[in-house]
Amino acid sequence: MDLSNPPFLPGRNKALDLLKWLAMFSMVLDHLRYVGWSVDFLYVPGRFAFPWFCLAIAVNLSRRSAAIVAPRVQWRYLGWLLAFAGLSEIPYRLFMADASVLNVMPTLLLGLVIAQGWQQRNPTTRVMALVALLLTAIFQKYLMFGFAGVLLPLVFVLVLEKRLWYALFPAVFCLAGNAWPQMFAGASWGDPISIGSIVACVLAPVLGIALLRAKPGFAVIPMRRWAYAIYPLHFLLLLGVRGVLGRV
């Protein structure tokens, strides 16, 4: 299986673009729970967002254009994530004032650095990966999805081109990164949201990798750098929706 989209081949990886759009859609569904509606069940489809973003990072790192043609630090990729990690924190805090963790971008950034250290084995990327691991260990309580979430892109890199059942390994990390004690406790007495969340965490890596191995027969809008802005802007949009609903 080849998930690469190197510059010397025409076209884009439509499956990867579709995966990113589905991850965005899942994220927005999850955050609709905070606008004032009684839609707690949206927590279940929301479990697909983070693993699919991590899978997209793994695919980008595994492309021949990154890993073979130019085996060096992906400074531009890191820079965009770092910039939007900072830009997103204010709208994130405005929308989720009681949040005890940072927005998801720092988790994805650290995960990218660690996965890159494995994928592109040179002294610079290795040192950066070790620093990222140290920062994760120190500040994991402030990171969304914790240590397991930071390691998820690396786990996807390791299983990306293996048989589909290997997707169970990132599924374990997906469960560990979520509130698994509460989910399993809820599932033990039959809570449908808890049961659905566990199923979603297990299925997300499997479905994501299966999608990437398919070839969509329809056009997909390319997810280019402008798409980074969706993350902070969707918080502001949902904040506005909550304000309108609060006046009704």
For each predicted feature, which ranges?
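Alpha-helical transmembrane segments and their immediate juxtamembrane cytosolic regions
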Residues: 1-248
